[in-house]
Amino acid sequence: MLDPSIDSLMNKLDSKYTLVTVSARRAREMQIHQDQQIENTKSYKFVGKALEEIDAGLLTFEKEDQE
């Protein structure tokens, strides 16, 4: 079983597409800057660490209003 689960992650963001985009951007940011918001992560891959940050509520996403 995956941890964090897709159900708990979907409670944090509005769609699977947003989840993929936010986690991929955060993973790339962690690769470049070598920074993490969680000290002890279960995952050793950057995408897994980003998903753990989303699940912990440390990483959020806000939509911009398009005019």
UniProtKB/Swiss-Prot annotation:
Stated name of the protein: DNA-directed RNA polymerase subunit omega
Keywords: DNA-directed RNA polymerase, Nucleotidyltransferase, Transcription, Transferase
Swiss-Prot/TrEMBL catalytic activity: RNA(n) + a ribonucleoside 5'-triphosphate = RNA(n+1) + diphosphate
Enzyme class: transferase
One biological process term in Gene Ontology: DNA-templated transcription
SMART domains according to UniProt: RNA_pol_Rpb6 (SM01409)
InterPro entries linked: DNA-dir_RNA_pol_omega (IPR003716), Pol_omega/Rpo6/RPB6 (IPR006110), RPB6/omega-like_sf (IPR036161)
Taxonomic superkingdom: Bacteria
NCBIfam families with a match to the protein in the record: rpoZ
GO molecular function: DNA binding; DNA-directed RNA polymerase activity
Family annotation (PANTHER family): DNA-DIRECTED RNA POLYMERASE SUBUNIT OMEGA
Pfam families reported for this sequence: RNA_pol_Rpb6 (PF01192)
Family: Belongs to the RNA polymerase subunit omega family.
Assembly description: The RNAP catalytic core consists of 2 alpha, 1 beta, 1 beta' and 1 omega subunit. When a sigma factor is associated with the core the holoenzyme is formed, which can initiate transcription.
